[in-house]
Amino acid sequence: MANYTAADVKALREATGAGMLDCKKALDESQGDYDKAVEYLRIKGAKNVSKRAEREATEGLIAVSGNTMVEINCETDFVAKNEAFKSFASKIAEAAGEAKVNSGEELNNLEIDGKKVSEVVDEESAKTGEKLQARRAVTIEGDNVAVYLHQRSADLPPAVGVLVSYEGNAEGAHAVALQIAAMNAEYLTREDIPAEIVEKEREIAEATTREEGKPEAALPKIVEGRLNGFYKSVVLLEQASLSDSKKTVKQVADEAGTTITGFVRYEVGA
């Protein structure tokens, strides 16, 4: 006969986040001793961490604190929308914001309550039974930073996050943040694109134009046209504005009295 009650199982679940069957087994193994049951679950969880490490963690959330943004991953949206997971991620984001961390390595080496984030993540992973990951972090410089977090559905946490540093009008910066979230710009200006990427696009444009049998004399003009199309797709300030497709993002921002000085976009799993 079991020497524990349903209330004991419930208390153990709430304290550890482990599943009901795991909690029952822990209480069985510990003969109803609560503290030993907690220890059993911690050991069991630690043993399973290496197995979880081989799995993919492509769900999760984006969180922002101050000028710092982090991505925390899990395996399923079931865990992603769990309040305990969201609270856990928020705690990491707050610590990252205070320390102004700027990489995944810095994030995982950051200490919270005397433990590295990587250790805290492993402990939380043991509770959830899923692989968890503090994947990356970035801090954007600037006195004025607009933040936008996008939820794909009302019951899920933000899956896309944008930070925009700017000067001038805040509403204009917010509109640009929405643009970045939706259109996934990669660079602020064309000058920010690495030369090797531009050269590769030029080579592709030339090869495509020749494959189409266009006259050699027309080649330079056609290639430049295709390169301009590439710029309009990846350069934020050259994209067509979502609020007025006849104008570029730069034109609309200028009219609003906003100057964009930098941005970062995160998307869960991307």
UniProtKB/Swiss-Prot annotation:
Q: Return the Pfam families for the record.
A: EF_TS
Please give the residue ranges the record annotates as the region Involved in Mg(2+) ion dislocation from EF-Tu. Answer: 76-79
**GO CC entries:** cytoplasm
Q: Which GO terms describe its molecular function?
A: translation elongation factor activity
Q: Which UniProt keywords apply?
A: Cytoplasm, Elongation factor, Protein biosynthesis
Q: What is its main location?
A: cytoplasm
User: Per the record's keyword annotation, is Cytoplasm included, yes or no?
Assistant: yes
**Localized where?**
Cytoplasm
Is the keyword Protein transport assigned to this protein? no
Q: What family classification does the UniProt entry report for this protein?
A: Belongs to the EF-Ts family.
Q: Which NCBIfam families match?
A: tsf
Task performed by this protein: Associates with the EF-Tu.GDP complex and induces the exchange of GDP to GTP. It remains bound to the aminoacyl-tRNA.EF-Tu.GTP complex up to the GTP hydrolysis stage on the ribosome.
Alphabetical list of PANTHER family matching this protein = ELONGATION FACTOR TS (PTHR11741), ELONGATION FACTOR TS, MITOCHONDRIAL (PTHR11741:SF0)
The name this protein carries in UniProt is: Elongation factor Ts
